[in-house]
Structures are given as structure tokens and as C-alpha cells.
Design a protein with these regions (language model features):
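Short, well-structured N-terminal submotif of metal-dependent ribonuclease cores
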Residues: 1-37
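A secondary-structure boundary/capping signal
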Residues: 5-7, 37-38, 106-107, 123-124
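PIN-domain endoribonuclease scaffold, especially VapC-family toxins
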Residues: 27-82
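Amphipathic coiled-coil/heptad-repeat helices and related helical stalk/stem segments
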Residues: 20-21, 60, 87-88
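Short, active-site-adjacent cap segments at secondary-structure transitions
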Residues: 10-11, 43, 110-112
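Active-site neighborhoods of divalent-metal-dependent phosphate/nucleic-acid chemistry enzymes
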Residues: 69-103, 108
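Acidic, PIN/NYN-like endoribonuclease modules and their adjacent C-terminal/linker elements
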Residues: 85, 96, 108-133
């Protein structure tokens, strides 16, 4: 299974230890599925951790490097303008390039799509339920 996490999943996994987002991220590290991300997603994640959570640069850098080691990092060209929030379009582009089965997100605009070009867009709870038989 090929999966793309939205920025909000990474931020929750890193900033809220012991939560469901961290559980999903740890499943990726364990190899339960193939995790894909992009430079744009990592850049946005770094900005949120630094600006909203006051993480120091070195802590942010370490977190982004850890994600980069557990996920395949892609560089899709920004071509989509389907959603008003441009970072949401970067998530869709990453999923397209990864040929992802799922996008996992807490973003209502992405979740409202439900599916895009063969990729199912799931909430974190729905994704975790799918992982557990």
C-alpha cells in the first residue's frame, strides 16, 4: 500500500507524542505501508513546527531528516490548482506522482474530495481502521 500523509498528520505525529498520528507514522517506520512525501510537504511541515510550535531550527531539521529516512521523498512539479489552498494541491500532486492508494489527512477540503485520480482520501481514524484487519 502506497500512502501520502498530509502536513497536519506529520505535525500531529511529531508535536503530540502518543497520539493516533504518531501511531500511523510508527506503522510506516515498521514497514506496514510505503510512505511517500515531497519537498513541498516537508517544507510546510518544517514551517508549521517552527512557527506554530516554536521548535528550534535544529529540532525541526532532525524531524524533517527522520521523515526523509522513513519516506520516499518526491519532487513533483506544481501543476494542480484544483483546491483554493495551494498546499493542498501539493499533497494531491505528491499522491499522483507516488501512484498512492491513499492520502491521510485531517484537512476538510481534502477530505471532501474523498478521491482524486484513483487515490482515496481518508481521515486518520479511517486509515488506522483500514490498517487493522
Amino acid at each position: 500500500m502506497r500512502v501520502v500523509f498530509d502536513t497536519n498528520i506529520y505535525v500531529s505525529a511529531l508535536a503530540i507524542p502518543g497520539g493516533k498520528a504518531e501511531e500511523a507514522y510508527l506503522e510506516a517506520i515498521r514497514g506496514a505501508f510505503e510512505l511517500f512525501t515531497s519537498v513541498a510537504i516537508l517544507t510546510e511541515t518544517a514551517a508549521v513546527l517552527q512557527n506554530k510550535f516554536d521548535w528550534e531550527q535544529e529540532r525541526v531539521r532532525n524531524a524533517i531528516q527522520a521523515i526523509g529516512q522513513s519516506a520516499t521523498v518526491l519532487r513533483p512539479r506544481p501543476t494542480l490548482h484544483l483546491l483554493q489552498d495551494e498546499p493542498d494541491n501539493r499533497i494531491l500532486e505528491c499522491a499522483l506522482e507516488a501512484h498512492a492508494n491513499h492520502i491521510v489527512s485531517g484537512d476538510r477540503h481534502l477530505l471532501a474530495l474523498r478521491q482524486h485520480e484513483g487515490t482515496t482520501i481518508l481521515s486518520l481514524a479511517a486509515f488506522l481502521a483500514e490498517l487493522k484487519p
